[in-house]
Amino acid sequence: MDSNTLSSFQDILMRMSKMQLGSSSGDLNGMITQFESLKLYRDSLGEAVMRMGDLHSLQHRNGKWREQLGQKFEEIRWLIEEVRHKLKTTENSFEQITFMQALQLLFEVEQEIRTFSFQLI
Protein backbone atom coordinates (compact mmCIF):
# COMPACT_ATOMS: atom_id res chain seq x y z
CA MET A 1 0.00 0.00 0.00
CA ASP A 2 1.19 3.49 -0.79
CA SER A 3 2.36 5.12 2.44
CA ASN A 4 0.43 8.30 1.59
CA THR A 5 -2.78 6.32 1.20
CA LEU A 6 -2.13 4.52 4.48
CA SER A 7 -1.55 7.78 6.35
CA SER A 8 -4.64 9.27 4.66
CA PHE A 9 -6.79 6.39 5.88
CA GLN A 10 -5.37 6.67 9.40
CA ASP A 11 -5.75 10.46 9.44
CA ILE A 12 -9.34 10.43 8.20
CA LEU A 13 -10.37 7.63 10.56
CA MET A 14 -8.81 9.50 13.48
CA ARG A 15 -10.52 12.76 12.50
CA MET A 16 -13.90 11.10 11.99
CA SER A 17 -13.67 9.34 15.34
CA LYS A 18 -13.21 12.74 17.04
CA MET A 19 -16.24 14.35 15.42
CA GLN A 20 -19.38 14.93 17.39
CA LEU A 21 -22.26 15.16 14.96
CA GLY A 22 -25.10 14.89 17.45
CA SER A 23 -27.85 12.50 16.41
CA SER A 24 -25.93 11.34 13.35
CA SER A 25 -23.03 9.89 15.36
CA GLY A 26 -24.39 6.39 14.72
CA ASP A 27 -24.20 7.09 10.99
CA LEU A 28 -20.65 8.36 11.42
CA ASN A 29 -19.66 5.21 13.32
CA GLY A 30 -21.08 3.16 10.44
CA MET A 31 -19.03 5.19 7.97
CA ILE A 32 -15.89 4.64 10.04
CA THR A 33 -16.55 0.90 10.11
CA GLN A 34 -17.09 0.88 6.34
CA PHE A 35 -13.85 2.82 5.80
CA GLU A 36 -11.93 0.31 7.92
CA SER A 37 -13.48 -2.62 6.06
CA LEU A 38 -12.68 -1.01 2.71
CA LYS A 39 -9.08 -0.42 3.74
CA LEU A 40 -8.65 -4.08 4.74
CA TYR A 41 -10.21 -5.29 1.49
CA ARG A 42 -8.02 -2.98 -0.59
CA ASP A 43 -4.94 -4.18 1.27
CA SER A 44 -5.80 -7.84 0.69
CA LEU A 45 -6.35 -7.26 -3.04
CA GLY A 46 -3.07 -5.41 -3.27
CA GLU A 47 -1.25 -8.25 -1.54
CA ALA A 48 -2.86 -10.79 -3.88
CA VAL A 49 -1.68 -8.78 -6.88
CA MET A 50 1.84 -8.63 -5.48
CA ARG A 51 1.82 -12.42 -5.14
CA MET A 52 0.24 -13.29 -8.49
CA GLY A 53 0.38 -16.97 -7.62
CA ASP A 54 -2.27 -16.22 -5.03
CA LEU A 55 -4.77 -15.54 -7.77
CA HIS A 56 -5.43 -19.25 -8.12
CA SER A 57 -5.68 -19.83 -4.38
CA LEU A 58 -7.94 -16.77 -4.09
CA GLN A 59 -10.24 -18.19 -6.75
CA HIS A 60 -10.22 -21.66 -5.15
CA ARG A 61 -10.79 -20.34 -1.64
CA ASN A 62 -13.57 -18.09 -2.70
CA GLY A 63 -15.26 -18.71 -5.99
CA LYS A 64 -17.42 -15.66 -5.36
CA TRP A 65 -14.61 -13.11 -5.27
CA ARG A 66 -16.05 -11.25 -8.27
CA GLU A 67 -19.36 -10.97 -6.46
CA GLN A 68 -17.53 -9.64 -3.41
CA LEU A 69 -15.73 -7.16 -5.64
CA GLY A 70 -19.09 -5.90 -6.89
CA GLN A 71 -20.29 -5.55 -3.30
CA LYS A 72 -17.20 -3.51 -2.43
CA PHE A 73 -17.88 -1.15 -5.32
CA GLU A 74 -21.46 -0.76 -4.03
CA GLU A 75 -20.06 0.03 -0.57
CA ILE A 76 -17.72 2.61 -2.09
CA ARG A 77 -20.61 4.25 -3.95
CA TRP A 78 -22.66 4.26 -0.73
CA LEU A 79 -19.77 5.82 1.21
CA ILE A 80 -19.28 8.45 -1.50
CA GLU A 81 -22.95 9.41 -1.28
CA GLU A 82 -22.84 9.49 2.54
CA VAL A 83 -19.71 11.63 2.55
CA ARG A 84 -21.22 14.00 -0.04
CA HIS A 85 -24.37 14.30 2.08
CA LYS A 86 -22.34 15.04 5.23
CA LEU A 87 -20.29 17.57 3.29
CA LYS A 88 -23.45 19.38 2.16
CA THR A 89 -25.01 19.45 5.62
CA THR A 90 -22.08 20.42 7.82
CA GLU A 91 -21.07 24.01 8.40
CA ASN A 92 -18.02 23.21 10.52
CA SER A 93 -14.86 23.87 8.49
CA PHE A 94 -12.90 21.07 10.23
CA GLU A 95 -15.62 18.60 9.29
CA GLN A 96 -15.84 19.97 5.74
CA ILE A 97 -12.10 19.53 5.22
CA THR A 98 -12.24 16.02 6.69
CA PHE A 99 -15.15 14.98 4.46
CA MET A 100 -13.50 16.52 1.37
CA GLN A 101 -10.35 14.52 2.11
CA ALA A 102 -12.44 11.40 2.74
CA LEU A 103 -14.17 11.87 -0.61
CA GLN A 104 -10.85 12.24 -2.43
CA LEU A 105 -9.53 9.14 -0.67
CA LEU A 106 -12.61 7.14 -1.69
CA PHE A 107 -12.07 8.08 -5.34
CA GLU A 108 -8.40 7.06 -5.10
CA VAL A 109 -9.20 3.76 -3.41
CA GLU A 110 -11.94 2.99 -5.93
CA GLN A 111 -9.41 3.49 -8.73
CA GLU A 112 -6.80 1.33 -6.95
CA ILE A 113 -9.29 -1.49 -6.40
CA ARG A 114 -10.30 -1.32 -10.07
CA THR A 115 -6.64 -1.51 -11.08
CA PHE A 116 -6.01 -4.46 -8.74
CA SER A 117 -9.11 -6.30 -9.91
CA PHE A 118 -8.18 -5.90 -13.59
CA GLN A 119 -4.76 -7.35 -12.80
CA LEU A 120 -6.41 -10.30 -11.07
CA ILE A 121 -8.91 -11.04 -13.84
From Swiss-Prot:
<comment type="similarity">
    <text>Belongs to the influenza viruses NEP family.</text>
</comment>
<keyword id="KW-0945">Host-virus interaction</keyword>
<dbReference type="GO" id="GO:0039675">
    <property type="term" value="P:exit of virus from host cell nucleus through nuclear pore"/>
</dbReference>
<comment type="subunit">
    <text>Interacts with protein M1. May interact with host nucleoporin RAB/HRB and exportin XPO1/CRM1.</text>
</comment>
<dbReference type="Pfam" id="PF00601">
    <property type="entry name" value="Flu_NS2"/>
</dbReference>
<keyword id="KW-0813">Transport</keyword>
<dbReference type="GO" id="GO:0044423">
    <property type="term" value="C:virion component"/>
</dbReference>
<comment type="function">
    <text>Mediates the nuclear export of encapsidated genomic RNAs (ribonucleoproteins, RNPs). Acts as an adapter between viral RNPs complexes and the nuclear export machinery of the cell. Possesses no intrinsic RNA-binding activity, but includes a C-terminal M1-binding domain. This domain is believed to allow recognition of RNPs bound to the protein M1.</text>
</comment>
<keyword id="KW-0946">Virion</keyword>
<feature type="short sequence motif" description="Nuclear export signal">
    <location>
        <begin position="85"/>
        <end position="94"/>
    </location>
</feature>
<protein>
    <recommendedName>
        <fullName>Nuclear export protein</fullName>
    </recommendedName>
</protein>
<dbReference type="InterPro" id="IPR000968">
    <property type="entry name" value="Flu_NS2"/>
</dbReference>
<keyword id="KW-1048">Host nucleus</keyword>
<feature type="short sequence motif" description="Nuclear export signal">
    <location>
        <begin position="12"/>
        <end position="21"/>
    </location>
</feature>
<dbReference type="GO" id="GO:0042025">
    <property type="term" value="C:host cell nucleus"/>
</dbReference>
